[in-house]
Curated annotation (Swiss-Prot):
One of its GO terms (biological process) is carbohydrate metabolic process. The modification Phosphoserine is found at S96. GO terms for molecular function: magnesium ion binding; phosphoglucosamine mutase activity. The lineage of its organism: Archaea, Methanobacteriati, Methanobacteriota, Thermococci, Thermococcales. Keywords: Isomerase, Magnesium, Metal-binding, Phosphoprotein. This is Probable phosphoglucosamine mutase. The keyword Flavoprotein does not apply. It comes from Pyrococcus abyssi (strain GE5 / Orsay).
Length: 451
């Protein structure tokens, strides 16, 4: 990670590390880097988003860059608008699934792909040196407002076709997806019920769509006998799914199902995922004639590998999916529509999920200050061989150790002050035993790093 940018742009607590002053410098740095051109900018529903957006816009205009402000917008709408308006870059003001006190700044290139670490380091260099381009009075950038929502919905409807109508419950989590996702599904011919769809910055539920945070969605689907529940995080770059039985569909299962559907739809090819994805994806994709490629965590890494390998689909086991035939921006709204197309062609999720191999996946977050992460990872690397016997090690992002029937990933979060442990085993007992050892190892490593 750089000084400002992590695995998903800048993401910090507002008015502590992420201030209007820093946002202004990011705008100036991006404008200096682009040296002219046009930038699309949008924001999520957080109370601080307008403040930060205006600061970024000021920096861009001051450096001579024209800005198209599309207002309240989910991340995928920004990615779509970059191409629609032939922009040179895009900026999203969002902290995605982080708590409401956080916000962030994420930059996208002209192809809708997140800025690579190399480009982010260049922006950091410009910020640190403060050698900003400042346009003369008669060359200051122009600011325009636009609303590409209708064009976005129309474009999705050209890609997604349903032969039948479904009852869909949508939970956008009071985020930016509230302004599009329900309307899209109505246009697709579905009966739509919404919960948590008021787009305010005081979120009713935890923004990360998981089994616990989507308990109300699950109850609603079951009570209404709906066909499916669709959920998003704060900026709708993710999708979470509840099946027709009111059961949350684990991310590993959904990742396998949608990867399989993309292989059926577009033909055999490579599926790109991250080091925290489990064995089920490999087994399922291999059975359909596909191949899995792994990379570091983060949508930009997935997008890079998709371009490198000409992959048919890229996804993380967090509900973050990239459909390269559509865009290189992770798009939870398009993904939700794609899930409906899949059940329209193949059957309801609860039945489809039975085809996916089931292993036990456990995840744990352990608090760790950002400035201790590097030292803690050094200590973890020393302790792992003493505590575990394993056959393979992968170090492209954190440390992943593997045997044929289990794996563990130790990784510092790029967006929060935590260490993440993700593991998978064939049985619950084995998984819990491994997690107990792994958790103790990480806590010991953090303790050593802090002494």
């Amino acid at each position: 990670m750089g000084k400002y940018f992590g695995t998903s742009g800048i993401r910090e607590v507002v008015n502590e590390k992420l201030t209007p002053e820093l946002a202004l410098k990011v705008g100036l740095a991006l404008g200096t880097y682009l040296n002219g051109g046009r930038v699309v900018i949008g924001n999520d529903t957080r109370t601080s988003s307008e403040m930060l957006k205006k600061a970024v816009i000021s920096g861009l205009l001051a450096s001579g860059v024209d800005v198209i402000d599309i207002g309240l917008a989910p991340t995928p709408l920004v990615g779509f608008a970059i191409k629609l308006y032939d922009a040179d870059a895009g900026v999203t003001i969002t902290a995605s699934h982080n708590p409401p006190e956080y916000n962030g700044i994420k930059v996208w290139d002209r192809n809708g792909m997140a800025y690579t670490p190399e480009k982010e380091r260049e922006l950091e260099r410009i910020i640190e040196e403060e050698k900003f381009k400042r346009a003369p009075w008669n060359e200051i950038g122009q600011l325009k407002q636009a609303n590409p929502r209708e064009e976005y919905i129309e474009a999705i409807m050209k890609e997604i076709k349903l032969d039948n109508s479904y009852t869909v419950v949508i939970d956008p989590g009071n985020g930016a997806g509230s302004i599009i996702s329900p309307y899209l599904h109505r246009e697709l011919g579905n009966r739509v019920i919404t919960i948590n769809s008021d787009p305010h910055g005081f979120f009713v539920r935890e923004l990360e769509p998981n089994k616990e945070s989507l308990s109300m969605l699950a109850k609603t689907v079951k009570a209404l006998k709906a066909d499916i529940g669709i959920a998003h995080d704060g900026d709708a770059d993710r999708v979470g799914v509840v099946d027709e039985n009111g059961e949350f569909v684990e991310y590993e299962v959904m990742l396998s199902l949608i990867a399989g559907y993309m292989l059926r739809k577009y033909g055999k090819g490579k599926v790109v995922t991250t080091v925290d994805a489990g064995f089920a994806l490999d087994d399922y994709v291999r059975g359909l004639g596909g191949e899995v490629v792994r990379t570091r965590v983060g949508d930009v890494a997935v997008a890079e590998e998709l371009m490198k390998h000409g992959g048919v689909f890229g996804g993380e086991p967090s509900g973050t999916w990239i459909m390269p035939q559509w865009n290189l921006t992770p798009d939870g709204i398009f993904a939700g529509a794609l899930v409906l197309e899949m059940i329209d062609r193949l059957g309801l999720i609860g039945e489809l999920a039975k085809e996916v191999p089931r292993y036990v996946t456990l995840r744990k977050k352990i608090p760790c200050p950002n400035d201790l992460k590097a030292k803690a990872m050094e200590e973890i690397a020393k302790l792992i061989p003493r505590e575990f016997s394993y056959e393979r090690e992968i170090t492209i992002d954190g440390i992943r150790i593997e045997n044929d029937d289990w794996w563990i990933l130790f990784r510092p979060s790029g967006t929060e002050p935590i260490m993440r442990i993700t593991l998978e085993a064939h049985t619950k007992e084995r998984a819990e035993s491994l997690m107990e050892k792994a958790e103790k190892l990480v806590k010991d490593a953090i303790k050593k790093a802090s002494s």
